[in-house]
Amino acid sequence: MKKFLAVILALVFALSGMSVMAFAADKDKAQAPLCTLNKDGNAVNWFGGEDGEYYFFISDSDFAGKYTVTVKASGDVYLDGAKLEDNTFVLGSAEGTITSGGVDYKYHVVCTAKLPAVYITTESGSMDAVHADKSHKEAGTIRIYNEKGKTEYDGALDYIKGRGNSSWEMAKKPYNIKIAKKTNLFGMGKSKKWSLIANYSDNSHLRNAAVYYAAQQIGLDYTPKFVFCDVYTNGDYQGVYLLITRIEANSKRVDVANLDDVNEEIAIAASGNEDLDMDSLPQGGAYGRFAGLIEGTKKWVEIPEAPEGYTVDNTGGYILEMELANRYYGEKSGFVTTRSQPITMKSPEYASQAQMEYISDLYQRFEDAVFAGNGRNALGEHYTDIADLESLAKYYMISEWCSNMDSGLTSTYFYKPEGADSKLFAGPVWDYDIAFGNNEGTRYGCNYNNPEEFTVCFGRQYRNTVFGKLDVDYKPTVYNRLCRRPEFVEACRRLWYAGIGDKLAETAAEYIFNTSRTIKASAVADGIRWNIYGTCDAAKVAENYEVAAAYLEDFATARTRFLDVNLGRVQVQGKVKDQLPAGLRNFLVRVNNLFEAVIVNFKLINK
């Protein structure tokens, strides 16, 4: 009978793809005691690796004799065969064995890099609610230290919550945080609101940092500032992150007037409710689930009329984001251009109807001019009368240099300062974890993994039809059309050879290499924590990390060489390879248009 059960169990493991060793490791994890190291008043729990062994992740390589470990277990506990008094011991060696309940648990100390560290403790003592709902906010406390261990902030945490779109679906989560007091963290400017970027899909952890560094070097205004840091939540090591400034209307971030503050002040004054929640105000316009598909529509928040004595300058400031149609629904304010491009409002998030009318009209005139044969819209305005040519050129060059698949589609920003004569500006840059050949490869015939091929200048809209990923319409992006304009190409060429090319070459040759060495130990710890390479062997993880960083460096270097020779040749016809036969594609376009007509004519746009 025992042999029969053994055969059945072996068959179950074989069919499930799970090894007996893995099963035993999972069982041991469930029964394992919790071991917590006290590092300067901060708890650091050991982590159960995929190999069935346990890991303490700390930044201090000279740890011997400094830190006390507490073992939470019932019954006697042993360290390397010696019984512990009070179930505590002083960490001495880089590895050892804890015995509890007759089971041995081997542990290792993994030293991270000398990076800043962030320790977050939530009120519940858990991150489960945050991970279950991206919008859930949890308060707590937070300690932030610089690379020398000096305190940058130690106090209340108003909240930690999820952030991101596709990145939120990954194992290692990105977060937004709000601390209780405006603080100038690491000299990045005073603010309460910050982001923690996980870079889970980027094994080098360097793509976002490389682009932000390069954008700062070439003078793209309001580029996010950042530091690498190791993050712990409730004692659990989460890996290496970017602590980064957020894109918001703020004199220390994007220096434009904050219309959200103005609108909230008016709404409170008009309602007489000091505790008014802006989310309680009704939406207006086309705000339903399918609104992002319907060209020429707008949505806003019904801000009450300003009481006597209040004035509003609706000329600015604005921060706009190009977005995919399937994400448009979740935003409070926005508009869809006549060429199907959804634009959401980063600021003001709660835009009034008058503000939406103003900014959507301005952007539409810009788009019309870009797509016109002579670069002028029906009013005779040239696109450079409406938008700043230099920022457009710099933004495009950064995007083309890193071969970013998302540029012109999503996470693509414009801002407009207040003033009737002020222009739209391209930027700030944001979100480059799938750049530099770290993506699905080809789209519309462009190979984003080939450093010697133009990509962004051939960009097409994506998912802005009812068919989602099938995307049957292939409408060109604004940057696609700009790259056919002689004056735009000339501006790119002039700026490149005036110094931008050299700065991007320096980023590729020096910044990426040097920074990879700086963060390597934390990248290795992160690789073990998240089983990135399928092994917990630190030496093997380090080898794999070096390969990932070298690939990025080589890609960026090759990309810089390619653009140095070919940038002046961007002025070419758009390039599309249909993913569907022409007949089927045309049929689906007609179905899409019929669907949109039904939504509009039967007044389903807000359903």
PLM-predicted stretches and their roles:
Residues 1-8:
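Positively charged n-region of N-terminal signal peptides that target proteins for export
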Residues 15-28:
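Sec-dependent signal peptide cleavage junction
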Residues 25-89, 105-106:
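Predominantly extracytoplasmic/ectodomain segments of secreted and cell-surface proteins
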Residues 77, 218-230, 404:
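Short, well-structured beta-strand/strand-turn elements
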Residues 91-103:
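Append "Rare intracellular matches occur via the same short Y/T/C beta-strand/loop motifs
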Residues 138-198, 351-358:
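Conserved oxyanion/phosphate-binding beta-strand-loop segments in alpha/beta enzyme cores
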Residues 170, 328, 341-409, 414-417, ...:
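Middle-to-C-terminal accessory/interaction subdomains
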Residues 183-184, 198, 220-222, 237-397:
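Internal "kinase-insert"/substrate-recognition segments embedded within catalytic cores
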